[in-house]
Structures are given as structure tokens and as C-alpha cells.
Amino acid sequence: MTQVDLVVVGKFLFKEKIIDGSIGIEDDKIAKFSLRELKGDKKIKVEKGKIILPGLIDVHVHLRDFNESYKETIASGTKAAIHGGITTVFDMPNTKPPIMDEKTLKLRELIFKKKSYSDYALGFLIAGNEPAKADFYKIFMGASTGGIYSKNFEEDYKKAPDIVSVHAEEYELINRYPERPPIVEVVAIKKALQASKKMKKPLHICHVSTKDGLKEILKANIPWVSFEVTPHHLFLTRRDYERSKLLKVYPPLRDEEDRRYLWENLKSIPIIASDHAPHTLEDKEAGAAGLPGLETEVALLLDAVNKGMITIWDIVAKMSINPARIFKIKNKGWEEGKDADLIVVDMKKEWTIKAENFYTKANWTPYEGWKVKGKVIMTILRGEVVMEDDEIIGKPRGERIVKEGNAQGNLGSSQEH
């Protein structure tokens, strides 16, 4: 091919294998994967021992802003995203005020256009209201942060014109069991699965945390249903509550048996997402539920690769390829013609997680002091370096995702590529 705008040279992951070569970038898109060194106007040579991966997609992020800008802003949260190797975030709509009408949705988009350092998808909350056109829809089956939930899940689910991300905790059981034991999640998952099977509508179940909940999803095996797990449910358990009262989260941290079952079935889990939910330390001490995670999720997973718990392909499948396919994102993925979103990881870098080095306003992390091996050292968004060696580069240049159309039909296997 003729000369391109930018060539990134080094080892990169391609079809489950790490190969030597180069990636040609033209007009913000991946123009060519090559086994040889392509010619370009500019060149980035990735040092030996480091690997080029696709920019990652986090389908579950709470960026606060609006009346909770003291907790997080779109600017601070998307800086945290690109610092952690996340190039596209899905913005959860249970904000203050909540995104439940077209006017608020448009205001949200205006702020993103001006302030976002990463690309983004806009969510819309349904709880008895009529949906406006968004990139995805969110339904809470029980109260969480913000307190708004659906009183009639089937009716609200039926209204949604595109894929629904559901917080599966049954509201009637929450009232009876405020500590939210596994049954609260399992009953809600069963209810959501039954509705999806009946309506044949796409559904994404957020933060599956229990052995029995995951069993229900796998047993149902509904082609248009996807789901996610979070790093905190993979790496923490109820025993961690003993070391910190700040770890309150919905759904709660579970028993070791649940955590182990998630790991044992990781190949069947299509998506890993952070559920980044920042609060100030004061709010956490007062009982707010939610954990920050944008700047630790990839680090924890790279460390797991080094420990032989997962493969680097698992990360790419569950945080790039599958999210782009399941949510029908036309311009994202690890293919020629898609946006040139790349990250460079140093698999040998040993470091200690410290909240003081993060961009999120949360100012704390559940993993403070953890020693990990593997780090994101560069983030490229649509052909531009936006983060290198922990420093954010340039001004906000985030753009809204481009959808292929409504996310529907067979979502395919969890490891499709």
C-alpha cells in the first residue's frame, strides 16, 4: 500500500497470536495490519518486550458530573479511562439529575463533546418514562445509587428501542433483605431472562456476581442475552470488608465460592467491565455504594495474565471485540477500517497501585498498595497519542460511537473474533 499517516511498529496481538510487524493508520482508521514495516509520514516504534493491543471498551462507567461534579466529571473520568487503557466508555444514566428525557440527554452530549478525553456511548434511563434515542438503555430492577428503579420491568424493557443494560437486583427482595444476599440477584436474573426469551429482545446483564446467577444465565443460553462481570467481583470477596468499610458496592462482594466460580467459567463470560462508580471518601464513610475502577481494571487483568490465570486474548475479546460486536458499534474493533484505538502494554513493568497517581476524583482505590506486574504505558485514540507514561496529552477529542443499527439478534459466542 502507499504511505500512510502513521505507522506503529512492534509486537501486536492479531488473531490470538502475538506477531512482529506494523499497523498502518490513515484518516484516524486502521488501514493495514502487516508483517513488515509499512511506510508512514510518522512512526512510533514500540520497544522490545512491549505489546500493542486494541484500545479497550468499558460498557459500564458512572461518570457522575451534573450535580455530582464533586465526585467525578466527564473530564476527570475520561482522563482516568485513557490513563487506564480504556478508549471508549459507556456512560451510565443514573446521574443527578437522571438522564430520562431528551433535553437532559442532549445536555449530556454537549458536555461530552466539549470535555471528553475518550470516545463514548450515551445511556438513557427507563423507569416508567418514554425513551429518547440513545446508544443503549439502562433499567434498574431494584434501587441503587440514585434511587430510581423500574416498578414494571417487562413494560419498561418492552419500550426500549435498542439493547438494555439491566441492574439485576429484585426491588421487593431488597426491601426484605437490605444486605442483598445472592437470592436478590438470582431472582432478578431469572425474571430478566424470562422477559428476554419471551420478547426476543437484546439484553445485557450487568455485574453478575453470584455462582447461582451465572448458572441461570448459562443454563438459559439465550443467543441475544449478554452479560458482564467486574474486576471487584473477580478479585475481592466478603472477607475484604474486614479490612475496609469503604468497599460497599451493589451487588455486594460475595463469598470465595462465588468468586472462584466466576474464574472457573471465565471463558463463557463475554464482557469484563469496571462499573466505575466514584464517590468522595466522605460519602463512602457515610455509606455510599460503589467503587472506582477505570485505572485499575486493566492492570489487575494484565497481572492475572502474568500469573497464568487468563490470556492476553481474553482481555482483548472481553474488553474490545465482544463489546463492539454485542453493542453493534460500527467504528470500533480490532479490524482494518475500524478506528485506530490502540494501547501499548509493558507486561514486565512491576508497580504498586496508589490512588495518588490517578486522575479520577475518587482519591482512593480498593487495591491501594497492591503490587502488580503489567501496565498500560501508551494510549492512542483514533490515531493520536493521548496518554504516554501516565501523562495525558492534548485536549479533549472524544467522539460519540457510531452504531450499526439496533443491537439485536444472535450475539454470538463469548469468544467470537
From Swiss-Prot:
Pathway(s) where this gene product acts: Pyrimidine metabolism; UMP biosynthesis via de novo pathway; (S)-dihydroorotate from bicarbonate: step 3/3
Positions contributing to Zn(2+) 2 binding: 138, 167, 207
Positions that bind substrate: 62-64, 94, 279, 289-290
Reactions the enzyme catalyzes: (S)-dihydroorotate + H2O = N-carbamoyl-L-aspartate + H(+)
Protein name from the UniProt record: Dihydroorotase
UniProt cofactor(s): Zn(2+)
Entry note: cofactor: Binds 2 Zn(2+) ions per subunit.
Keyword Transcription in annotation: no
GO CC terms, sorted: cytoplasm
Gene: pyrC
